[in-house]
Structure formats: C-alpha cells, structure tokens
Design a protein with these regions (language model features):
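Short, Lys/Arg-enriched N-terminal segments with co-localized hydrophobic residues
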Residues: 4-21
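A short, Trp-centered hydrophobic/proline-enriched beta-strand micro-motif
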Residues: 27-41, 80-82
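A short mixed-secondary-structure module that forms the rim of ligand-binding clefts
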Residues: 53-88
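Charged, gly/pro-rich active-site loop segments
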Residues: 92-151
C-alpha cells in the first residue's frame, strides 16, 4: 500500500509541475494578446494572427470558426506552430491541435472572451475549439538562454 501512496504523490507532483509549466505558456500568450498561428496548406505555409487562449480542464485551448481556411488546414494536418513576442521575449509553441466539440469547452472559451459572442455561440455549429497536445514551447530572448517547456 505504501508504494501506491508514493506513486500518487509522484503523480500529483508531476501534474503540478506540468500545470505550472503550461501556465507559464498561458500567461505569456495572454500578456502578448496577439500570437501568430502557422499551418500548412499543401506545401504552402499559412500564418495568421490569433488572440484566444484559454485553460480548460488542465489543457490550453484556442478557438476559430469551422468555415475558415485555418480550420480545414488543421483538419488535414493538426501540427501547428504558434509564435508571439512581448516584453523583449518571444515564444514558439510547436504542438498538435485536437478538436474538442463539447459545448462545455466552447462555452468556457466564449465566457473567457465575451467580445466574441457577437460572432460565435457554443451552439452555432461554427465555433471550434482545439486543445494543445504534445506541446513544446521555447521562450527566448537576446539576453538569456532559451527556456524549453513541454506539456
């Protein structure tokens, strides 16, 4: 029984550290306000500004509309990269995006960004949220060594 208790403590410490690292990425993207999401369409890179980042059920989420080209690009290739700059530092996040079609996930995003409610609704069939999976974030600057965060 003691081994199981030790395992639970280890798991909790791992989960705590993972969430702490993920929060650092969340905080950076929130502070930047705008980040750039890169996808691929065929052999052509596509980059556009985004502004939504939300933590829901221990995962980082972004939001778009199903009618947008970015949605179709992610469906073909869910590997994306995000880049943002603020306060003399920049972040690059390489990850896979996984769609979460649950109303609760969409509602959480729209509650965090009420200004989007004029264009989106969790029940509209267009609102789309994705969470980041297998993410590696690198925070860099010209004055310090890069910090690598995996979540």
């Amino acid at each position: 029984m003691k081994a199981n208790a030790d395992y639970v403590i280890f798991f909790d410490e791992y989960t705590f550290e993972r969430r702490k690292m993920m929060k650092r990425v969340y905080d950076f993207l929130k502070k930047a306000e705008t980040y750039y999401l890169a996808t691929v369409e065929g052999d052509q890179p596509r980059v556009r500004p985004f502004g939504t980042i939300n933590e829901f059920e221990g995962k980082l989420y972004i939001q778009t509309g199903k009618v947008k080209p970015v949605s179709h690009q992610i469906a073909v290739n869910p590997k994306v990269e995000i880049c943002a700059f603020t306060g003399g530092e920049w972040i690059r996040v390489a990850c896979e995006l996984v769609e979460d079609d649950r109303i609760e996930a969409k509602k959480s995003m729209l509650d965090a960004y009420p200004n989007l409610r004029g264009m989106y609704d969790e029940n509209d069939g267009n609102t789309q949220v994705f969470y980041m999976k297998n993410a590696t974030a690198t925070i860099s600057s010209f004055t310090s060594e890069p910090v690598v965060i995996e979540f």
